[in-house]
Amino acid sequence: MFSPADNIFIILITGEFILGILGNGYIALVNWIDWIKKKKISTIDYILTNLVISRICLISVMVVNGIVIAVYPDVYTKSKLQIAICTFWTFANYLNMWITTCLNVFYFLKIANSSHPLFLWLKQKIDMVVRWILLGCFAISLLVSLIAAIVLSYDYRFHAIAKHKRNITEMFHVSKRPYFEPLTLFNLFAIVPFIVSLISFFLLVRSLWRHTKQIKLYATGGRDPSTEVHVRAIKTMTSFIFLFFLYYISSILVTFSYLMTKYKLAVEFGEIVAILYPLGHSLILIVLNNKLRQTFVRMLTCRKIACVI
């Protein structure tokens, strides 16, 4: 029998899963239809499509991981299912983080203004740069997940041997750390692409500040289009920073939940909060992206008309 906390956890995480799949699936579908109609895809749509696919994978593996850990902990710790789930989690996590970083760097290169030769070259070759970056994102994520799988396999064999030998000391560690995997701690190093995103964010804010100063010299009332684009990009990047901070903190909570008396509750809470990152940021992208937002509004309008008819 599940406890009330388990029931609440399953309901919440199922709701997050549905919203996450619908939100990210909507972005992928809109971009795919637009690609079919125009026979080409813009760089921003290409990045977003890759991003939401990685987030669908991330949300799916996080939901499976959360349910198995919280509801069936014995199955998780006593089988090789742990290796498979955590390897896919690492791959999806790193891929998602690096593609999001690619998106933030794209915003900076596309919107910001600078006279630096390197910046001008990257801005001119942005389409080629983005495609190479995305290829690099996939390669890095695959390499990291393979290394993580090896580390986790070694850890699994070590604890199996310790348990088999009935060594008191090792058995103590095995029994006291059911939710602590090297892979979870390994995923915390995804802060590296986050730092790159943070640098892009501050450079974009600096560009907006300089642009605003120039506007004031000639200025007239209202915002110019460039300022609006700056502000929209900064809103998107700010939401990413905030949601990733929650994701990072919740990952730390899950990682060290074995130290807490109510570790199962800590794991459930951490998983629920962590999924808000790939779910919430994609919903914010829909709201702040003109094409995605207008398409959604047209869908609602058509549905209302159909209901009236």
UniProtKB/Swiss-Prot annotation:
Keywords per UniProt: G-protein coupled receptor, Glycoprotein, Membrane, Receptor, Sensory transduction, Taste, Transducer, Transmembrane, Transmembrane helix
Keyword Lipid metabolism appears in the UniProt entry: no
Misc: Most taste cells may be activated by a limited number of bitter compounds; individual taste cells can discriminate among bitter stimuli.
Family matches, as InterPro entries: GPCR_Rhodpsn_7TM (IPR017452), TAS2R (IPR007960)
Pfam family name, one: TAS2R
Protein name: Taste receptor type 2 member 8
Organism: Gorilla gorilla gorilla (Western lowland gorilla)
Residue positions the entry lists as glycosylated: N167
Transmembrane segments: 8-28, 51-71, 83-103, 132-152, 185-205, 240-260, 267-287
Topological domain spans for side Cytoplasmic: 29-50, 104-131, 206-239, 288-309
Subcellular location: Membrane
Family membership noted in the UniProt record: Belongs to the G-protein coupled receptor T2R family.
Molecular functions per Gene Ontology: bitter taste receptor activity; G protein-coupled receptor activity
Function: Receptor that may play a role in the perception of bitterness and is gustducin-linked. May play a role in sensing the chemical composition of the gastrointestinal content. The activity of this receptor may stimulate alpha gustducin, mediate PLC-beta-2 activation and lead to the gating of TRPM5.
PROSITE patterns with a match to the protein in the record: G_PROTEIN_RECEP_F1_2
PANTHER family referenced in this protein's UniProt entry, alphabetically: TASTE RECEPTOR TYPE 2, TASTE RECEPTOR TYPE 2 MEMBER 8
Topology with respect to the bilayer: Multi-pass membrane protein
Gene: TAS2R8
Gene Ontology, cellular component aspect: membrane; plasma membrane
